Every structure is written in C-alpha cells, then in structure tokens.
C-alpha cells in the first residue's frame, strides 16, 4: 500500500502535503477547511505580537505563471492562532499542526516565543525569518550575523520544537554560510522557500498591485527551480536532525515528488491552493501516489533525497 505519511521532529502526519503560511489560514474557519481536507497538517497565518491589517489592496494578483503579492503580514495576532490550535488539539482526531510567528523586532520575537514556550502548546512552531513585504523591515535571514545572534538568544530559553522559514538563497557560498549557522542550533526543520522578494509584474503600462509601487513577492511556477535548489542544497548541508519543508511552485503530484526527491519531508502549497482551494490536496495526493506506484515506491523514504546526478 503506497503511503504519503511522514514525520517531523517525532510528530506524525498522515500526508506530507499542507498549506503554506499566508494561504487559507487567516481565520479559524479557513484553518478548519484545511483541517478537514486531505492535507496532513496546517500552518497558521504568520502571527505578529498584535493583529495587523497589512498593506493596502490590491495586494495579491494571479499571473500566467504564478502570483505576485505584497500582503504585509495581515493577521489576527499570534495569540488568536494559539487559542485556535489549542482548542482544536483537544479533539480526539486532531492532526498535528504548525504555528507560524514573526516579530517585527527582536523584542517582539522573544515576547511571542516566550509566551509560546510557557503555554500548553507542545507542537511545532515556524519562525518566519523571510517576509519580503513589510516596509522598512529587511529579511532577517539575509543577514547572517543577525540571524545567528537571534537564534542564540532564542535557544537560550526555547526548548520546544522550532523551525525557521527561509527566503531563497542564490549563491552557493550563502548555502554554506547559512547551513553552518543553522547546524549550531537544535532546529527541528527549515522551510525553503518563501516567495522571491521584490518582483514586478506589469499589465500594459501599469503595475498590478498597489503596495511598494507594484513590487511584491513572486510565487508559483516562477520559483520552483529556485525552491528545489534550496531544498536540495540544505538537504546536502544540514545536520540529519534538521528536516526540510519544501515550498514553491507546487501545483501537481510531480511538483511534490520533485521536492521530496530533493530532500523535503513535507511539502507546502501556496499559490495553487489560493487559486484551487483545499480540494487541491486530494488531487495532488492522488497524483503523487500514482507516480510512486509507477516507480515502485511504497514510502516517501524510498526516494527522499535520492536525486540522481549526471556522470
């Protein structure tokens, strides 16, 4: 029997597919749609210390090869999502989940994580080091010194399972430098990649989103080769204890298969989920299973990370 089950940091998931933070996860109602779908888990909207309205609309637009967005981290506040997940996990058949958070300052980050650490929540937390769409706030994970300092401070008190969501890296040296930092810490996972920041899409003579004069994060088909490269580069470099979540350009079973082949333990879906809705998890799961049957694979471990190279 072919299985797409997986695990991260000892947490079991019946399916390796889930949403990406930012898509179908703003409200309790949306999270419940993912919970009752074929997805193996959900991750909440990235929660900040206080609720945020985000950037002015229009701030998201589909494009022929994906999407562009400059959402600006709209969310209900991290405490809202903590309450939703704690209530949900009281249910007998609850799945395991991820809570996504970000601080708009180091102080905010520590306040959020210290609250999560002292809470009843025992599950996985995804710390976003990679949002490209908050005006005046750089992507932390591109500053290696700041990243190392922040993680050093966090792991001085945080002992629950924690992973980080990363921006795309494009230089081999940066893969080496980033991995060397991450390997110093007891991270449960890294999530590669967030959208490619500061793309520009034009319709006739006008940009198609309002914030930042049209600049926004690019997702969908555009970013799959970059996402696969990041997944595989970190799979080659990170300690085996640090697992990888692959995100970027997944709209078919073949796309999910390629992420796992590059080393991903779970696969998140963003743009395609936004366009197709939660039923996408059923379709992509069946497509992935069909590929596994055709290739004679029973479990994800049969091919995870086993990308072939040319002689």
UniProtKB/Swiss-Prot annotation:
InterPro entries with a match to the protein in the record: Aldolase_TIM, DHO_dehydrogenase, DHOD_1A, Dihydroorotate_DH_1, Dihydroorotate_DH_1_2, Dihydroorotate_DH_cat, Dihydroorotate_DH_CS
Enzyme nomenclature, EC number: 1.3.98.1
Entry annotated with the keyword Flavoprotein: yes
Pathway: Pyrimidine metabolism; UMP biosynthesis via de novo pathway
Positions with a binding annotation for FMN: 45-46, 128, 165, 193, 220, 248-249, 270-271
Pfam families: DHO_dh
Reactions catalysed, as given in the entry: (S)-dihydroorotate + fumarate = orotate + succinate
Subcellular location: Cytoplasm
GO cellular component: cytoplasm
Record-annotated active site: 131
Keyword Oxidoreductase carried by entry: yes
Chain residues that bind substrate: 45, 69-73, 128, 194-195
Keywords linked to the UniProt accession: Cytoplasm, Flavoprotein, FMN, Oxidoreductase, Pyrimidine biosynthesis
Stored Gene3D superfamilies: Aldolase class I
HAMAP family: DHO_dh_type1
Job of this protein: Catalyzes the conversion of dihydroorotate to orotate with fumarate as the electron acceptor.
Matches recorded under PANTHER family: DIHYDROOROTATE DEHYDROGENASE (FUMARATE), DIHYDROOROTATE DEHYDROGENASE (QUINONE), MITOCHONDRIAL-RELATED
Family assignment from sequence similarity: Belongs to the dihydroorotate dehydrogenase family. Type 1 subfamily.
Protein name: Putative dihydroorotate dehydrogenase A (fumarate)
